[in-house]
Amino acid sequence: VNMDDYVKDQVRSKLIRVKCMNLMAKEKGVVLSRTQKDAVSSAADTFFNALTQEQVSALNVTKDQIEKMFTEFAIADTLYDDVTSQINTEVSSDDARVITIQYICAGSKSDISSAKERLDNGESFYSVAKDFGGEEESETECKRGEMEQAFETAAFNLKTGETSSIVEAGGKYYIIRCTSDNEKSKTEANKTALMDEKKLEYFNSVFESYEASKYVEMNKKVWNSKKTANTAELPVSFETIFNELVK
């Protein structure tokens, strides 16, 4: 698959999903509020007025068509919020916790025991880790679910400044030092991301069978004639305007 076909497939899938979401919204009686309609109108004005006459001609688009597109995306967004409002998306602060650690990694028990002995004798964690990790500083941020379970358990049980005993995980041996047991701003961001993941997972479980039951026909002749390489760069972004004025 070449890049042109890949991009077009992504756009096609997005447009089909939005169309199907609008069908579901109609069946569920989901409509835009007056405030949302005003926001859509403002977004369409902003987008259309930013285009030159040459760009309007090249796109072969009218203001009404642009407003219809903003409307359909707004309805899809409203449906998503309506469906996902029915579930509990709460994520605990501990589940979302982001920590920062340093670690020493060795391929054998004897090597990691040697590293531990050096630490016990007062050498700095950084200097020992550097010897085992080459020039790279073995420091990283960690979230739950990203590491081997034994490594994760040991890392998340540490408080800031604490060092673990020897941990075996994935066929290797580690000593872990916690430099921060809670990166608070990143924990909050991760909490939001995990809640969004829960929403998307639930929505997909509800929507995908519905979408599969619908047949959306596209004008293949027109669609196949479109090439992303021939698309001129526009002074405005549909997605940016939608997120700023409508979402």
Locate the predicted segments by residue:
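PPIase-associated folding chaperone regions across multiple families
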Residues: 55-117, 130, 149-247
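Short, well-ordered alpha-helical segments enriched in acidic and aromatic residues
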Residues: 125-134
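N-terminal targeting/tethering segments
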Residues: 1-61
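Residue-level recognition of oxygen-bearing side chains
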Residues: 20, 111, 124
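Hydrophobic (often cysteine-bearing) scaffold residues that line and stabilize catalytic clefts
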Residues: 4, 8, 12-13, 17, ...
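Short helix-loop boundary/capping segments
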Residues: 139-141
